[in-house]
């Protein structure tokens, strides 16, 4: 998250938020990270030794058998839908703020000039909300924390729908703040759910499957679907109808929230969370 913030500030303040130079900056950072990774200590995986593992186990495909468990399968499905929501905000958040330059009254506003910096409030919020997760987990349990995340996604998109760089600036700021809850509460509570619902021999693969459903399949689903819908229904020669776009995203998140509350059954057991270690 801190690296995310640093990248956003660097590209915006150097005037590269919309230029090809941002990819050079990312490439240099990636090379540095790759070199640093070779200096990290070895961490052997739990479970069977590699000699006794099948090829399916070695490449992590054994985790797909978790779909045979109804509750886990339902959780991974909702993870994909929430991953799509994350892709929506990553793909269009900054573009939306920058697009206010089309309106004469906002063309010279700080929101347009520093759109990426303003969006970075979302990541700053992440670092703060993650500190509140232990309290919420103990007080409400994993399912309720996930539901809070989904409600936060509804607010994230809904506030964007009505925000503007003028008297609606507060909505944009609040939208960025609630993003921290939307992102952290599902990702952390979801990871804990996987941790407490799977056997230690398959746990690392299960966590990988969780990430793949959110940042893999979810991102693909969100990108393809939103791109088609926006171009087909919400784009004209005058530009994009951002108000309706964000309202549509908010309705999407609301439907997911209601469906999750109805279909996902999970009994909170505080002892499970307390037993989770590193």
Please tell me what each predicted stretch does.
Residues 91-115:
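Short amphipathic helix-loop junctions that connect adjacent transmembrane helices
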Residues 11, 128-142, 230-231:
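Helix-to-loop junctions at the C-terminal end of transmembrane segments
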Residues 12-29, 228-253:
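A membrane-interface helix-boundary motif in multi-pass transporters
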Residues 151-165:
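C-terminal ends and interior cores of transmembrane alpha-helices
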Residues 42-76, 102-107:
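Juxtamembrane intracellular "pre-TM" segments in multi-pass secondary transporters
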Residues 185-199:
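Intracellular juxtamembrane helix-capping segments at the cytosolic ends
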Residues 30-42, 245-278:
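Multi-pass alpha-helical transporter architecture, strongest
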Residues 68-89, 177-178:
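Pair of pore-lining "gating" transmembrane helices in MFS-fold secondary transporters
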């Amino acid at each position: 998250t801190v690296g995310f913030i640093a990248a956003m500030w660097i590209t915006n303040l150097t005037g590269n938020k919309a230029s090809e130079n941002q990819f050079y900056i990312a490439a240099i950072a990636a090379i540095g990270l790759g070199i640093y990774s070779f200096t990290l200590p070895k961490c052997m995986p739990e479970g069977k030794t590699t000699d006794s593992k099948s090829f399916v186990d070695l490449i992590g495909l054994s985790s797909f058998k978790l779909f045979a468990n109804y509750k886990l399968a339902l959780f991974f499905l909702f993870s994909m839908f929430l991953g799509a929501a994350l892709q929506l905000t990553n793909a269009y958040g900054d573009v939306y703020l920058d697009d206010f330059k089309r309106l004469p009254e906002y063309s010279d506003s700080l929101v347009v000039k520093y759109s990426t910096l303003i969006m970075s409030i979302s990541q700053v919020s992440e670092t703060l909300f993650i500190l509140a997760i232990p309290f919420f987990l103990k007080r409400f349990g994993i399912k309720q924390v996930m539901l809070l995340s989904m409600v936060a996604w509804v607010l994230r998109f809904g506030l964007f729908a009505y925000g503007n760089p003028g008297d609606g600036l507060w909505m944009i700021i609040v939208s960025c703040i609630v993003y921290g809850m939307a992102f952290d509460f599902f990702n952390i509570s979801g990871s804990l759910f996987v941790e407490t619902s799977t056997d230690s021999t398959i746990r690392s693969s299960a966590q990988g499957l969780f990430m793949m459903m959110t940042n893999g399949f979810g991102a693909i689903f969100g990108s393809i679907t939103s791109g088609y819908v926006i171009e087909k229904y919400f784009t004209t020669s005058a530009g994009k109808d951002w108000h309706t776009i964000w309202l549509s995203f908010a309705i999407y998140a609301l439907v997911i929230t209601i469906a999750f509350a109805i279909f996902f059954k999970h009994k909170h057991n505080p002892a499970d969370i307390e037993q989770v270690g590193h």
